């Protein structure tokens, strides 16, 4: 048999068992002009923020991603987000930010909350999932926590009634409850998710959380193909640490979502690897998923050992939001390869690598 015939037979055999089939998916057909570079507002923030945002900048440059950053210095001790920063976000529609430290107590409000309220970023989304190669107590965890971002206990409606007595108001409206429920079910529908769980405390807060549940139930009727159930928040936390694989998409009021997302992140590998973002009708802000106020310890900053994985994955979410799916896939795949390989991991993941070493490893894995 000739060498040419032997080669043809080998190729036929490879195609027959599937190993020669290309893995590229059905092509993404962009609209004319979709490849034009997009401006993104960049807020490095406090603590580890500049380290991890710089990691994103390096990877984007290595990928030749069609975005460019407008960088602004914003810090948690500021009383307000500077007007020029808000103007940039409103113009660009998209922002990537590091952690902004929130002072505990005192009269300084959280800039993270200010951004959400002023831009009407009504939905916070945190994706908590197992990364191949990263050992955790539980397997098959893939939870999306969707949290109402603009009202509830975080509305900031507090005052001192008389000396020594402080009143803090929890505000729940039908409009905001329906809006977040619609977003959760729409997300589940568009991402082939099978179940939405509403988290509440309506057994005690019968009017406020009762209104939230009523709104979720009304929206659920419009999505008969998606299973809907409800769970009390304290039982939810217990179930999360016992059997997290039972959850799919979770929709919550503001405070509960913060607690649930951080718990789910801890179960799936830690806040250092969980992506997330905040979205409204017109704007989106992407950040480390489970803790917007996480600025790390001074020692981590001094040693340059901040974990950039969460913000890199959040950047992949941002690229999909900007209609650059192939760049998002390349970035996400490279990050997952580095985690699976296990050679470059920061201290929170059981390694000794620096931020730069992780960045270099991700860049080396880019297709």
UniProtKB/Swiss-Prot annotation:
The keyword tRNA-binding does not apply. Ubiquitous. Predominantly expressed in roots, stems and leaves. It comes from the Eukaryota. Disulfide bonds: none annotated. Pfam families: Iso_dh. GO terms for molecular function: isocitrate dehydrogenase (NAD+) activity; zinc ion binding. Keywords: Magnesium, Manganese, Metal-binding, Mitochondrion, NAD, Oxidoreductase, Transit peptide, Tricarboxylic acid cycle. One of its GO terms (cellular component) is plasma membrane. This is Isocitrate dehydrogenase [NAD] regulatory subunit 1, mitochondrial. It comes from Arabidopsis thaliana. The lineage of its organism: Eukaryota, Viridiplantae, Streptophyta, Embryophyta, Tracheophyta. The gene is IDH1.
């Amino acid at each position: 048999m000739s060498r040419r015939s032997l080669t043809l037979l080998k190729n036929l055999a490879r195609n027959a068992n599937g190993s020669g089939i290309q893995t590229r998916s059905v092509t993404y057909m962009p609209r004319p002009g979709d490849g034009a570079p997009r401006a993104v507002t960049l807020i490095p923030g406090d603590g580890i923020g500049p380290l991890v945002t710089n990691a994103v900048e390096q990877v984007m440059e290595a990928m030749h991603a069609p975005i460019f950053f407008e960088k602004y210095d914003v810090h948690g001790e500021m009383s307000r987000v500077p007007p020029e920063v808000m103007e940039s976000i409103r113009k660009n529609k998209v922002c990537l930010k590091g952690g902004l430290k929130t002072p505990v107590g005192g009269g300084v409000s959280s800039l993270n909350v200010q951004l959400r309220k002023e831009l009407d970023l009504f939905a916070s989304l945190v994706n908590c999932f197992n990364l191949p190669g990263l050992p955790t107590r539980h397997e098959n965890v893939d939870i999306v926590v969707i949290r109402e971002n603009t009202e509830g206990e975080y509305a900031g409606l507090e005052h001192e009634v008389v000396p020594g007595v402080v009143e803090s108001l929890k505000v729940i409206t039908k409009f905001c409850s329906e809006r977040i429920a619609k977003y959760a079910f729409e997300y589940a529908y568009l991402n082939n998710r099978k179940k939405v769980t509403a988290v509440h405390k309506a057994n005690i807060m019968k009017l406020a959380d009762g209104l939230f549940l009523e709104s979720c139930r009304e929206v659920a009727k419009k999505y008969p193909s998606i299973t809907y159930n409800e769970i009390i928040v304290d039982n939810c936390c217990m179930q999360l640490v016992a059997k997290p694989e039972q959850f799919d998409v979770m929709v919550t009021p503001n405070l509960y979502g913060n607690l649930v997302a951080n718990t789910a992140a801890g179960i799936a590998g830690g806040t250092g690897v969980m992506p997330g973002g905040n979205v409204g009708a017109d704007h989106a802000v992407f950040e480390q998923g489970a803790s917007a106020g996480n600025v790390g310890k001074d020692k981590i900053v001094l040693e340059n050992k901040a974990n950039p994985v969460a913000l890199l994955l959040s950047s992949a979410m941002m690229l999909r939001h900007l209609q650059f799916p192939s760049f998002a896939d390349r970035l996400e795949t490279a990050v997952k390869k580095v985690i699976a390989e296990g050679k470059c991991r920061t201290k929170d993941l059981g390694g000794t690598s620096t931020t730069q070493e992780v960045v270099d490893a991700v860049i080396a894995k880019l297709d």
